[in-house]
Amino acid sequence: TFTASTSTDFSTQVNALVDSGVKVVFIPFYAEEASTFLTQAKGKFADDVYFFGADGLDGILGKVEQDVTIANNVLMLTPFAADSTEENVQSFVKAYEAAYGATPDQFAADAYDAVYVIKAAVEKAGSTSGAALAAVMPELEVTGVTGTMTWDADGNTNKNASAILYFDGVGSVFGN
């Protein structure tokens, strides 16, 4: 079982994965635990092994600043890429950097978009009632810094994601 108190020693998992000869390792953790796993894994896997995770890995470079190559071959699926050339993304990134002195991650971008989603829902519903907002969600299409979002009748979000590949301390949109 994975808990905060057991997230400091991944040697058993690392060794088992290395011995199995895998080419892709799924790491479903947040950046803090992932940095521990990747630090313990460094140099043990072949150079062509990739570590795949989702947006919880955002911020991984800040967790491995002592050696950014620890994050080499980390592939993260996320709705936000700060290096996107989209005008609205670049405006958001510049404003965020000016205000906070740091590049925004997907958590900041999702929070930013959430405010505009709520605004659009309130305007469409003409109300702040939770039931009224939920009722109009399937009618909304909101374009934010994390992309264009729609919602189905069950409230599930539909939104594209980008894959970010880290190498030598740089995260770039994979495939570009």
Where are these predicted regions, by residue range?
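Extracytosolic ligand-binding ectodomains
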Residues: 1-176
